[in-house]
Amino acid sequence: MHEIEKTKRKRNKDILKMSKKIAIIGAGMMGSALAYPAFENGNEVRLVGTPLDRDIIDGCIKNNQHLKFDIPFPQGVKYYQFEDWKTAVEGVDFVIGGVSSFGVDWFLTEVLAHIDPSVSVLSVTKGLINLEDGTLISYPD
């Protein structure tokens, strides 16, 4: 066996050892887009829709594809409606919050407040937040 081939095999074994269980909360464009590289890098991916994502998750379950994407998700991505989110986050290594800025408060109260504090959480929020006086500010201002 060539040295290059040995190196590739060792790297692949190392990647498998590093694989993580990831729950992505939010099946919109951002959360769903992250499912591809997360899975392709050897991780178990659980995509959880918010209450606004019911049709998206139904489509994923039926066709393995987001309603607005041209390509299907990798085989093996698991899909959950929001009412099953607690099942989806059981045993995960980390949670990705893939909700819009207008959903951050919802994510904090409905999800983050109930996740085991030992689980790492990453937020990929983009956009603006609307203050009570009508002022728009960007996260994390």
State what each model feature region is.
Residues 90, 94-141:
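Rossmann-like NAD(P)(H) cofactor-binding subdomain of soluble oxidoreductases
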Residues 74-90:
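A structured beta-alpha segment of the ubiquitous adenosine-cofactor-binding alpha/beta core
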Residues 18-71, 78-80, 110, 131:
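NAD(P)+-binding Rossmann beta1-loop-alpha1 motif at the extreme N-terminus of oxidoreductases
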Residues 52, 86, 128:
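Residue-level detector of flexible, active-site-proximal loop/helix-junction positions
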Residues 6-17:
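Short, Lys/Arg-enriched N-terminal segments with co-localized hydrophobic residues
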